[in-house]
Every structure is written in structure tokens, then in C-alpha cells.
């Protein structure tokens, strides 16, 4: 997981090619402000819209859009898995040719990026297609066995609009594969981030605290303790980071001196912020206090990261500042409102778990019957 915010004075990884060994001219204050302002905006968009879509996703009945629920056990293991993955990538780049590794990774993320971008733009297609558009339904079905022993391996339903989205996303994919252009990189990065915030759901606030706390330690260790994360971030030519050129004003779209923000700094706080939005809705008070508080906390934390980075002239682990802000601000609000118990007792069931679904239905029916009994009395 790439989670470091790069230091423009120490050089950034280039999304369009290998790192330039020659000394680059210093970026102008205007260029730096534009770059980091754009990174901040790009980070906020998938968090805001991903959180809104996560609410519809939790209520939806489409099996292909069911969220993946992260439990406390998953959260505790995640920093260990992320560390092993990061160290493995670092060793691969040290042992094998960087060119061949990035070629394989490019093909892998080419496919993933097309699917993620297609899923991202699909909801907007209804606004662009006329009502008379022939939207035909399709089904991709793979089964194993026959008769009573037949099992579904793949059962995917889609329509003509989904095929149009796939075609448009493929154009971006080919552009990225051939040019590694920073705009194509960002389109894929934004799609990955939005899909992550939308489809990855924490089951409760305690799990969110475990996940963010573990990755807080992970981020600090791998950025300050070693050069592993920064090395991987600069070597890894894949859309796992948002980038923006600091020399855009001088070189236009061919600019190549990039500031970057890892997708982990967007998705990890983003899924916690999305959880707080769903908690707000569960309170049924027609306010989104905790969502807006955590959203403002994210802006504060990322802004502080950028400020500290320029003071110390060193790449910063953004989660060092984002985690205390995104957890601390909402908890302080909950303390002030006397809703700490409600916040930490809020629980989301896994929609893919039949037992949880049954339990949820039984709970709903019980609540409804109690409500009827009260009305009769």
C-alpha cells in the first residue's frame, strides 16, 4: 500500500516514465500550490461521492454490488498483510528488472482499471442516454455439473449501457497502457478510490479504530523507519497513487515533476468517513453531523501533512496526521452530544452472510411487531 505524500524538494516519482536522474529546476510557489490543491481536491471527490454511494450500496439488492464487510479480525491482520506485500514488492524491485515487473503490473492494472472505471461511470449513463435507447439485458453464466448437482460459478447480469461504459473505459485503459499519462493514471486512481470507499464497509466504529490505528503504525514505520515505501512508490508504475505535476504552468500536459498521494491515504480514511455517514443516517435525525465533522477533519489532516512536509522537506506518512484527526474529531463531537455509546454500539451486518441477513430480517420483524403492539395499546 502506497501511503506516503511526496516531498517536492526531494523529487517525486514520475507517472509517465522512469525517474529522471538529472537535477530538476525548483518548482515555483504557484506550481506547488496548484499541485497540492489539486491533490487535495482529487482526494475529497472519491471520499464524498463514494460515501454517498456506499449508502445506496448497503441498501441495494444487486448481488454484484454487494459490499465487502471488514471485521475486527480483518482489520487487525490488514497492516501485517500490507507490510508483507510492501516488503515483497521492494525485494522484487531490488532483485528483478524494474521494466519487466512494471510491464506485468501494467497489464494487471489495465484490466482492473477498466472494470473499476466502468463501474464508476455506469450510474451516470442514464442521464446521457435517451429513453428510446434500446437497452438490452444480458447475462454471463458459467455453471459446473448438471441436473441437481449444477453449481453456478459466474452469474453476471449487464446491459447495453454497461457495454458502452466498458468501451469508454477501455479507451482510457489503452491510453494509460501506451503512454502512462498522468491524467489516465488519475482517472484509474479516482475510480479505484471511489470503488474502495463505496464497496468496502467497516462493520462498526471499533473495527475502524483498529484498522486506522494499525495502519497509523504501519505508515509511520515504513516511511520514517526505512526507505521501503518511498522506493516502492517511485519504482511502481501503476495507478496506485494520485499525481499532479508541479511544473504544469511551465510545461503544460507534458509536465513531469510530480507530487503524489497514495490511494491508501484516500481509501482508508474514506471507508471510516463513509461508515460515519451511515451511522448518521441510522440516527434518523436528518443531520449528517459526524460525516461532515470527519470530512472536515480529513481536510485538516491532509492540509497539515502538506504543511509539515514543506517545513521538514521530507516525505510524510499522511496517516500520521489523518488518523488522529478522523477519529478524534468525531469522538469529541460524540462526547459533546452524549452519543458515544450509540456510536460504538452501531453495527452493520455482512449482507453476503445468509445468517446475518436472516438475523437482520428477524430483528426488523421484531421491531415492527413491537411498534404495532405499542400502537394498539
Curated annotation (Swiss-Prot):
The chain crosses the membrane at residues 32-52, 78-98, 101-121, 158-178, 182-202, 210-230, 257-277, 291-311, 315-335. Signal peptide: none annotated. Widely expressed with highest levels in kidney, liver, placenta, lung, leukocytes and small intestine and reduced expression in heart and skeletal muscle. Expressed abundantly in the CNS with highest levels in thalamus and medulla. It is an enzyme of class 3 (hydrolase). It holds the Pfam family Peptidase_A22B. Residues 1-27, 345-377 are annotated as: Disordered. The modification Phosphoserine is found at residue 367. Glycans are attached at residues 10, 20. Keywords: Cell membrane, Endoplasmic reticulum, Glycoprotein, Hydrolase, Membrane, Phosphoprotein, Protease, Transmembrane, Transmembrane helix. Catalyzes intramembrane proteolysis of signal peptides that have been removed from precursors of secretory and membrane proteins, resulting in the release of the fragment from the ER membrane into the cytoplasm. Required to generate lymphocyte cell surface (HLA-E) epitopes derived from MHC class I signal peptides. May be necessary for the removal of the signal peptide that remains attached to the hepatitis C virus core protein after the initial proteolytic processing of the polyprotein. Involved in the intramembrane cleavage of the integral membrane protein PSEN1. Belongs to the peptidase A22B family. This is Signal peptide peptidase. It comes from Homo sapiens. The gene is HM13.
Amino acid at each position: 500500500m502506497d501511503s506516503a505524500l511526496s516531498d517536492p524538494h526531494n523529487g517525486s516519482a514520475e507517472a509517465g516514465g522512469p525517474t529522471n536522474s538529472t537535477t530538476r529546476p525548483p518548482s515555483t510557489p504557484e506550481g506547488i500550490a496548484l499541485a497540492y490543491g489539486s491533490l487535495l481536491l482529487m482526494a475529497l471527490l472519491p471520499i464524498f461521492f463514494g460515501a454517498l454511494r456506499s449508502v445506496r450500496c448497503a441498501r441495494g439488492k444487486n448481488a454484484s454490488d454487494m459490499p465487502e464487510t471488514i471485521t475486527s479480525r480483518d482489520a487487525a491482520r490488514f497492516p501485517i498483510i500490507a507490510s508483507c506485500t510492501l516488503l515483497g514488492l521492494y525485494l522484487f524491485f531490488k532483485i528483478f528488472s524494474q521494466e519487466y515487473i512494471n510491464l506485468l503490473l501494467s497489464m494487471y492494472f489495465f484490466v482492473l482499471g477498466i472494470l473499476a472505471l466502468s463501474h464508476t461511470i455506469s450510474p451516470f449513463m442514464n442521464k446521457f442516454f435517451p429513453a428510446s435507447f434500446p437497452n438490452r439485458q444480458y447475462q454471463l453464466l458459467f455453471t459446473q455439473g448438471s441436473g441437481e448437482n449444477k453449481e453456478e460459478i459466474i452469474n453476471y447480469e449487464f446491459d447495453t449501457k454497461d457495454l458502452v461504459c466498458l468501451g469508454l473505459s477501455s479507451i482510457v485503459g489503452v491510453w494509460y497502457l501506451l503512454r502512462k499519462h498522468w491524467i489516465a493514471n488519475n482517472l484509474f486512481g479516482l475510480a479505484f478510490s471511489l470503488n474502495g470507499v463505496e464497496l468496502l464497509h467497516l462493520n462498526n466504529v471499533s473495527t475502524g479504530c483498529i484498522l486506522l490505528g494499525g495502519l497509523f503504525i504501519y505508515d509511520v514505520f515504513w516511511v520514517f523507519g526505512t526507505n521501503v515505501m518511498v522506493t516502492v512508490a517511485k519504482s511502481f508504475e501503476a495507478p496506485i497513487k494520485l499525481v499532479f505535476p508541479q511544473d504544469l504552468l511551465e510545461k503544460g500536459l507534458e509536465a513531469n515533476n510530480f507530487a503524489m498521494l497514495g490511494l491508501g491515504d484516500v481509501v482508508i480514511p474514506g471507508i471510516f468517513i463513509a461508515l460515519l455517514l451511515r451511522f448518521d443516517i441510522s440516527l434518523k435525525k436528518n443531520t449528517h453531523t459526524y460525516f461532515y465533522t470527519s470530512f472536515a477533519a480529513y481536510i485538516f489532516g491532509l492540509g497539515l501533512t502538506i504543511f509539515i512536509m514543506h517545513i521538514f522537506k521530507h516525505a510524510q506518512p499522511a496517516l500520521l496526521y489523518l488518523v488522529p484527526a478522523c477519529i478524534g474529531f468525531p469522538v469529541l463531537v460524540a462526547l459533546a452530544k452524549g452519543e458515544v455509546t450509540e456510536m460504538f454500539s452501531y453495527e452493520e451486518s455482512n449482507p453476503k452472510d445468509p445468517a446475518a441477513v436472516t438475523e437482520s430480517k428477524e430483528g426488523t420483524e421484531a421491531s415492527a411487531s413491537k411498534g404495532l403492539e405499542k400502537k394498539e395499546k
